[in-house]
Every structure is written in C-alpha cells, then in structure tokens.
Amino acid sequence: DEGKNNYLMSVVCMSDRYGISAADITTGDCYVTEVDKERKLLDEINKFSPAEIICNDAFFMSGIDMEDLRHRLHISVSALDSWYFGDEMCHQTLQEHFKVSSLEGLGLKDYEIGIIAAGAMFRYLLETQKNALVHMNKVTPYTTEKYMVIDSSSRRNLELVETLREKQK
C-alpha cells in the first residue's frame, strides 16, 4: 500500500520475555522494546501491523496462535536459524551498522532481548536486501508503559489507520 508503513518485525522469546524490533526499510524507521506478557506482545504486533515477522524457535513454541497471525492479520511468520539470535553476533551487527563501539549511546542499554531482536533483524535485512541500509541510521527504544495502548478493535473503530468504508488513510 502506497503511503502506508511496511514493517518487518523481529520477535525473540527468551526467559518469559519478548524482545521486539520493528523496522520500515522504506522510511528507515526502527524501534526496539521488550514486553513481559503475551497480551502486550500482541498489542505491539497490532500496533505495527507488520507484513512479516521473523522470530526464534522459542517464539513458535510460546503458545502464540500462529494461525491467527497468518490468516486473520495476514502476517507472514517465519523462524530463522538459531545463529541469527546469538547475543555476540547481534551486538556486533548493530555496532557495525551504526558505527559505534557500544550500544549504550543508542539508548539500548536496558534492552538486552530487544538488542537480540534488532541484531537478528538487521542481519536478516543485510542478507535479503539488495540495497544498502544507510538510511536506517537510528533506532528508537521505547517502553510500552509510557504510552496508552489502543487495542486493534478500538483503533479500527476510531478510524486511526484507515476509514471503515473506503479503507483509505
């Protein structure tokens, strides 16, 4: 859809927490967060409405309804090989991409699982995109507690994303 963000989301399930990174490679927008409940994860998925989710195997085994994501929300979901989610590799991928010696300056100090999600996503993008990712020059960490969550039904009824009749923005 022209004029609509086209997000790729990376989800990592680890230690009963979820690391989330979402990026739109056309605009360069990139976000990182962590949540501790399935409901909050689903809220984030609904908020970004990604075209694709890449994830680790633990996410597939976490009990999330993959068929619901695939069919009702029309999201492609695929698990990547475990090496994508290696802690050291993810840190290194982000440090090289953003040309920093530490991720602290990017505001990611308190987002260990989010760093893994973002690192795996950037590694995946580097391997699958024909173009350089130079326009993706910042990452925005955020906490869900600082924002009011509007569920998908309310978002649709309030026509925040598109109109109900014409499906226009």
Positions of predicted regions on the chain:
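Charged catalytic and DNA/RNA-contacting regions of genome-maintenance
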Residues: 1-169
